Amino acid sequence: MSVSAQGRGNGTGNMRHEALDELSFTEMISSVPLDEKTAALIRKFQDKEARERVLKSYGLSRNGCNVETFRNKEVLLITIPASKLFYPNSTELRPDAANLLNPVTRYLKEPDMYRVLIVMHTDNTGSEAYRERITEERSTAVFDWFEGKGLDTEYLFSYAYADEMPLKENNSMSNRDTNRRLEIYLVPGQKMVDQAKKGRMVF
């Protein structure tokens, strides 16, 4: 079961886009179509963004986080262990969670340059209702953190997938810890696509 950020405001007077809020996670990943020329420019831009900014904040050696590309290298994916954001069985963010969320705030400052997807996962421990609840409430907590910073969350979308998308088999403590995670997808927005088509991207 997944849940999106449907119907949330952002405290800044901006209206959400109902059509976007209704998209599934899979649909949102491809919500801005790209021709090959535009896609090539965006891949180049995202590669630079990953190397010069994202990897410096979320390198493999930092808190178990990981950075990779997604969807033909057009989307950046940041993975943060849930244990670095939440205490066990808790849906309240840890006091130091801001250290790992702060680097994402820059991607919400220019509306629709990026569509930022926050996707919460857990392992197969507990009942189905528990797994759904904890991922829904944790994804909401992350969304609300960004909203509470006074950021424009018009293009921020949250999803909860319980234990539906494990990275590894849930057959050891280590594997279950890997499956409990927050994924943040930095998806090119319409503004980025328009800039690429007009030759206005800065590398």
Residue map of PLM features:
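N-terminal targeting leaders that direct proteins to extracytoplasmic destinations
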Residues: 1-75
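Terminal low-complexity, intrinsically disordered regions
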Residues: 5-28, 161-165, 171, 189, ...
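Extracytoplasmic/secreted proteins, especially bacterial periplasmic and envelope-associated proteins
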Residues: 24, 92, 96-103, 133, ...
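Periplasmic peptidoglycan-binding/anchoring modules of Gram-negative envelope and division proteins
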Residues: 55-71, 86-119, 184, 191-198, ...
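Short, aliphatic-rich beta-strand segments
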Residues: 76-81
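Short, histidine-centered active-site or binding-site loop motifs used for metal coordination
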Residues: 82-84, 120-124
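Periplasmic OmpA-like peptidoglycan-binding domain that tethers envelope proteins to the cell wall
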Residues: 122-200
